[in-house]
Each structure stands twice: as structure tokens, then as C-alpha cells.
Amino acid sequence: MIDLYSAELNEATRFLLARGLLSSYNTAHKQNPRHGVRELVASYWRADPPKMVGSVPHAELHRELTARNSFDLRFLDGALMTFKYEFSASGKGQLRRSAVSFLPSPDLTVFQEDPELYLGDALFGDVVDEGAVTVPLRFDYDAREAVVEELRHPVSHLTIGSYKHCRIPLTCGASPYYVIEFVLRAFYQTPTLAWSSDLPGPRTEPPVATISDLERTLIHVALPTA
């Protein structure tokens, strides 16, 4: 499983680089097994792990991650993406935990409004759109019995903003392809540009649903499942 996730992330990174959408990146590597766990993470997670959850304001967290080079992908508009995956080191190497964050830049105009500013290599550091509200997103997966609690802490969930207890149920975990495709389609698609349609397809099979029957009866986010 870790090989498929690694392939998806590497292929997506090469795709984004080839189309000039990234200004910087850090490659995630498959770590050696430790305590029955094998991680797929970039080096910044091992050296000085960033604190992605807490009361730090979005703008401050974004500036800190950028200054420390603590991200996997940095888009031309300054938006960051971080990926952290943990797999079982035995058996089929199933996914145990994951945390994927999208942190839009708090300082620049959004890509959709004027893509030529970014694709034309213009200097846009002083361009600020006061009407755009930047909100971080985090896709989490954690199937540990001690953590999971129906509705309050779904196995797979989406957090919008920095609300500590915001956990919108997802139908299942999301591999790198699905999160990156969502980000491209939701935040970088314009009437003439549809990057997500050319993104290399998923390597992984749709996972088994983790959402409970009760969670399905309420507002939730659906991902492709087996």
C-alpha cells in the first residue's frame, strides 16, 4: 500500500512541476519500519515536526511553515500542502493514520481570479484581495479504537478552518490523488484551465467505507469507495 501512495504523490508532484504550478516542494520518502509502523513523510516531519493542530492562527502557521520549508508542495500563489501517512509494517501494510492539509496563502489574491499573475511569473507579493477569505482544510484518517467515536471523531473526517472540534465525516480515507485532484478542481480551475482533468489517475483501489450508518444520515462528504 505504501508503494502505491508514494507513486501517487510523486506522479502528482511531477505533474504540477511540469505545468509550472509549484514554486517549491519536498519529496516524501518511505521510512524504515519502526515499532510496527512505516511512515511516508518528507524529511521536515522527522527533523522538527510542525504543530498542525492547535490554536495558532492560520496566517501565523502559514508563515512559520513557509519559513521553515515545512511543506510537501508550495504552489505559485503561496498555498501549501502537507502529507503524512502511517502504514502497518506487517501483513498487507494497510493505512493506519493519515493527515493531509491544504493551507492557502493568507496574503495573495486567489489563483482563479487572475491566473496570469502566477503563470506569467509576475511579482505578485503586494497583490491582496480583501474579498477572499482563506480557510485551511485538513483531511484526517485514524482508525484506532481508542480515538474513534461516532459523530464526535469519525474514522475519516474533514476539518474546515482551525476549529478544534470540527470533524465532518468522510466516507473513507483519501489517497494523495483524491486530495490533490480536489484542490486543483476547487481552487485552481478557471473557465479556460482545468488542471485536474489531466492529473495522473489513482494507483490505489477505492477503499472500504469507514463512515457509520448514523453518520451517513447527516451531512457528510462522499469519496469513491469500494
Where do the PLM segments sit?
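N-terminal "first-domain core" detector
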Residues: 1-81
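Short, hydrophobic/aromatic-rich beta-strand segments within well-structured domains
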Residues: 82-84, 101
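Long, compositionally biased interface segments
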Residues: 168-226
